[in-house]
Amino acid sequence: MECSRTAVALKRQRFYGLITMLFVLTSSSGAKAADNIIMGMAGLNFSFLPFQIAMEKRFYEKYDLSVKPVLMRAQAAIPALVSGDVDYDTHFGSLVRGAVSGLPLRVIFSTAEKQMFSLVVQPEIKSAENLKGKIIAISSFGGTQHLVTAGTLRAVGIDPDREVKMINVGNEAVRVEQLRSKQIHAAMINPPMSVMMKKEGFGLLLHAADYLDLPLTGLGATTKKLKENPEQAKRVVRALNESLQFIRANRKETIAIFARWLKIDTEIAADTYDVAVKVLSADGTATDKAIVASIEEAKDTGKIKGNFTPRDVSDFSLVRAILTESKQKK
């Protein structure tokens, strides 16, 4: 009798175990696993807010994406992108320079139509003429920040090679510290730090957006990624496009997220938003004129020869497809 009861109990255990296993298998097959993506990030400022908004508002999750942002310098990010260690990258200028240098890269999304840099100067510098003979800090020679600084100076009649002394000091935090300690006279700084520096008494002498039609931030991928997994790339672009629209339509919440993200005062975040939102891309694309300007900027390094078209460095077909689909739904 006891053996019979034991046998029945074992059968029940096997039955319920089988049911449990079938339930787990059914649930697993029904749930779509999110794509794990590594994204190279160029910085932490307003121009990268669309990427942070996509995280906080779960736009990535909405499209089955698990994105890990990694802060990287362009010198490391571009090789990592080409090798496949990084899936997507945000160094717009470096992506363009890489493409015209022969690397298999394309810009597929633009978050900012123009540069947000302001030339932050010591209080005694009141005009472009006052910059002559002064020390201007840059992040690295040949990088976007260097080329933007040089282009802006040329636009106001200053020869960046002869009339000022440019020194390579590193990232924005270092440039800010050297401004505060008076080791340098000027440096291009992005918001919100440029806004904070103004409140500290520094001058904002020149704004790059007033002189240069250069896109600031965007997203790029390898041609291999776009060929082998266009569906994933489209989901990434779709999430970022929703993020752009959210930022424009939700000022108060965007400011709150921005302030929390960078741990800055809400007033600073609001001032930054009101200035910087004006140069955000309207729909994730960049004009041919802007892309050509980026190509010319790349050629200014003197290392790149030849003629290139916007199609050689960018591919906004995914964005345009999404925009067309959105119009058809309305």
Locate each region found by the language model.
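Bacterial N-terminal signal peptides that target proteins for export
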Residues: 2-18
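Bacterial N-terminal signal peptides
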Residues: 16-27
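Sec/Tat signal peptide C-region and signal peptidase I cleavage site
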Residues: 29-33
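Conserved C-terminal helix/tail region of periplasmic/extracytoplasmic solute-binding proteins
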Residues: 296-330
